[in-house]
């Protein structure tokens, strides 16, 4: 019987779509093409991405010595993404996952240390456990965006989101919630629907307590999009963007490796998603959908959109699947324009 890691490696070797998420978040094409044919065991994976991480870390150091700080910052973040791939491959909390996540955090903090944007490492308490977050503070903020990450992603993976939002002078707040990233790896806190409700509410209250005079926006993808819609019901939130929201009770066939990964981080096997049909949604929502999405059907998305208040927007991409991966950069630009309308 194949383990979850073996199933993940097989999927990565056989299906190019596996890599879409990682490619749009920064993983280089040549790094993927070099490893795919060789993906027979875990050691090949960790060795390859460790070398890629070290290579980019060295490149970042070289740029920094030449006073090319922006380039150095980017390549430190890219090196962290490769180390993040190594922690991600382990579905369950263990020493190896912890080791690679620590390497990821070291690279991220090297990037933060040389960045012109102030970064603060923060935390909140959920179910007597610490949830770890980061806040980035441009000098003259026009708004504050809470990035709600998909359950299978860490905040470090989505560094391009931060970069795009910060360039346009938005404060960014990004936490790893129950079952996610740094919080799961170091605290062992698993996801339940109730914990995610508490987490979303607490992050919004946290943002409001520090930035009460700045418009508060939400940006979420996949399960994070569903929780962004939930969060939009909070009166402190101004607007929310939902990219490919995951809908509960959807009769879909998810890949075996993904189901097993989720079972490792979810305590309540029923669902960790909010029941969107029970929410009193009244704030503006901009929803994005990929027509080729096999995780959430177009019919389900259309039905949800019809229930939203009149001040809403919808954009569907014919050639995109779940999370609209290859349109994410454009989606972030459109979202920032819409936030400020």
Q: What are the roles of these predicted feature ranges?
A:
Residues 320-329:
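Catalytic histidine-centered segment of alpha/beta-hydrolase-like enzymes
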Residues 225-272:
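Hydrolase active-site cap/lid region
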Residues 142-150:
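Short beta-strand element of the alpha/beta-hydrolase
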Residues 49, 53-56, 92-138:
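N-terminal cap/lid segment of alpha/beta-hydrolase-fold proteins
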Residues 280-282, 287-289, 293:
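Short beta-strand/loop motif that positions the catalytic acidic residue
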Residues 165-183:
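Conserved alpha/beta-hydrolase
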Residues 161, 283, 297-306:
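Short alpha-helix in the alpha/beta-hydrolase fold that links the catalytic acid
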Residues 190-211:
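Alpha/beta-hydrolase active-site loop
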